[in-house]
Amino acid sequence: MTLVEILVVVVVIAVLATMVISIAGRIDNQGKERSVKALLAQLDAAIQEYRDFTSAFPAQPEKNFANAPAHSELLYRELDAIPSSHSVLTKIDDSFIENKYGTADTPSEIYDPWGTALDYIYAAGDNYPALISAGADKVFDSADDITNK
């Protein structure tokens, strides 16, 4: 083999490796998107149970994505306090529920598969609460956000 042939083989292998890595990353993100959509559906069910029991949605009027962990913690606490919505919460995979920001006696937050706390927004006058995942870029209010609406 000549040096040129070896270089051609190395280039072909590098191109193939790049394609495989790119496809694997895309498949991973698609799986995470499906997971977060399923999570939002479970949380929607828990919110409906909460509403059926209390005749109201958990309030959280602040739209400030910097406070998403606090909003998520508030939602978890409210849903956990009602038996019917609590039973829905127990069906959520434990990998989405963590207590990263509080002490052991504070409620957990709800996280998406990328490790970002979900945001929850509901103000008086809204038709339905918004659950928002920041998506793969982990930045709220960007094109890849995933919501329950």
Sequence positions of predicted segments:
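N-terminal alpha-helical signal peptides/signal-anchor transmembrane segments
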Residues: 28-30, 39-57
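N-terminal single-pass transmembrane signal-anchor helix
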Residues: 1-27, 32
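Generic detector of short alpha-helix boundary/capping microenvironments
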Residues: 15, 43, 102-104
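Low-complexity, acidic interaction segments enriched in glycine
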Residues: 48-149
